[in-house]
């Protein structure tokens, strides 16, 4: 598991179950349920680099769409509406992507 040593498997499973239905994803609830919002800045950065699949230093829209699959390979893709809402919540500088500092603020929101 990509988040081994950062998040507990049972917390991840519970969070994924809560947003299994289309259009039910809420990033605040998800980060709280997986326990990421209570983690240290270092652990949040580690999580960012797992989600940044192309190692560009940013989480782009296509990576956000597949966000849940970072936590479990069988998880669903986010809907377009969920992806756009997630991006707009995290992209504080309007560049169309989420940097590591923006991600940390989003997790702690």
Curated annotation (Swiss-Prot):
Family under the similarity heading: Belongs to the parvalbumin family.
InterPro entries associated with the record: EF-hand-dom_pair, EF_Hand_1_Ca_BS, EF_hand_dom, Parvalbumin
Highest rank taxon of the organism: Eukaryota
Gene: pvalb2
Function: In muscle, parvalbumin is thought to be involved in relaxation after contraction. It binds two calcium ions.
Name of protein: Parvalbumin-2
MF GO annotations: calcium ion binding
Assigned keywords, A-Z: Calcium, Metal-binding, Muscle protein, Repeat
Organism of origin: Danio rerio
Repeat listed as a keyword: yes
CDD domains the record matches: EFh_parvalbumin_beta
Binding site for Ca(2+) 2: 91, 93, 95, 97, 102
Gene Ontology cellular component list: cytoplasm
Residue ranges of every copy of the EF-hand domain listed in the record: 39-74, 78-109
Taxonomic lineage: Eukaryota, Metazoa, Chordata, Craniata, Vertebrata
Keyword Metal-binding: yes
Binding site for Ca(2+) 1: 52, 54, 56, 58, 60, 63
């Amino acid at each position: 598991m990509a988040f081994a040593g950062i998040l507990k498997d049972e917390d991840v499973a519970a969070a994924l179950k809560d947003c299994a239905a289309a259009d039910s994803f809420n990033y605040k609830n998800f980060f709280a349920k997986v326990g990421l919002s209570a983690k240290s800045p270092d652990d949040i950065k580690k999580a960012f680099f797992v989600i940044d699949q192309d190692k560009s230093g940013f989480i782009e829209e296509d990576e956000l769409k597949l966000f849940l699959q970072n936590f479990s390979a069988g998880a669903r893709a986010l809907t377009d509406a969920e992806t756009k809402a997630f991006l707009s919540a995290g992209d504080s500088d309007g560049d169309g992507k989420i940097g590591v500092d923006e991600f940390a603020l989003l997790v702690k929101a």
